[in-house]
Amino acid sequence: MRIDAHHHLWDLDVRDQPWTRTIPVLRHSFTMDDLRPELHRSAVDATVVVQTLPTPEETPELLALAARDPHIRAVVGWTDLTHPAISDHLSELLAHPGGAALAGIRHGVQDEPDPQWLNRPDARRGLAAVGAAGLAYDLLVRPDQLPAAVRTVREMPDVRFVLDHAGNPEIAPDGLERWAALLAGLGHCDNVAVKLSGLVTRAPAPHAPSLRPYADVLLEQFGPERLMFGSDWPVCLRATDYAGTVAVAESLTGALSTDESAQVYGGTAARWYGTDT
């Protein structure tokens, strides 16, 4: 089973996405009716839909959608990680219609000014609650927050972590070595996987040549068994269409064996998010 481990959905008639206001290509609704034909064309069988807004209303809507749409096998939702009652909030989400699809939680740490935000006591308490609920935690961080992410992952071995967008590296001649050094600390932790996602929008066309060294680092440090493909649709449309995003990823992983490729394009996501293969 081929799994897209990272995409988004939104309906601007239901809720605004303020961050899209200056991005014309993203300034309209994107639904499963739009994505479904793209999945078919790229032979993708299942998906993991990921939250976009720090609002309590979005995640129940995604769970309800997962209950109706067989393509959506998992939801990475949002709840206030620092709220004292986070355990109760997670229980409520799991009991919601479609709650069985809740596989992870994400907070946009990249929007927090503090590079040590993950090491705050209230954040750590929330992460522990996520792990205790049997859920993964998606790390959405800036490169300067990677040291805090490394410390957090090391000190919380019972929590499953997923690093979104490879840690948002700067795709530049002087960016590779610095990013690889920061990432190495996570590579040694077996409780974290990483997404090959969100990179086409950071690299100039034709994308693959400038991204290949980064993909090589990911494979070297994490291996196929801890690497998962995600399209980051529709955000990827800023650079290329869905099929183009898949093609870039397949080019970057083309040297893998059939079994290794099956991990990147399904097996890793299925294990980390608990989806059926």
Set out the residue ranges of the language-model regions.
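Active-site gating/metal-coordination segments in enzymes
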Residues: E57-D144, R151, A193-V200
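Mid-to-C-terminal alpha-helical segments outside catalytic/metal-binding sites
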Residues: M1-I3, L26-A46, V217, Q221-M228, ...
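Catalytic metal-binding/acid-base residues of hydrolase active sites
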Residues: H8, L53, Q110, G167, ...
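Conserved, mostly hydrophobic/aromatic
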Residues: H6, T47, L62, V75, ...
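Catalytic pocket-lining loop regions of alpha/beta-barrel enzymes
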Residues: W117-M228
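Short, electropositive alpha-helical surface patch
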Residues: E57-R73, P157-L163, Y214-E220, T245-L252
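Alpha-helical scaffolding within the catalytic cores
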Residues: F30-L35, E57-E58, A85-S91, L146-P147, ...
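An N-terminally biased module of ancient metal coordination in phosphate/nucleic-acid-related enzymes
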Residues: M1-A66, A247
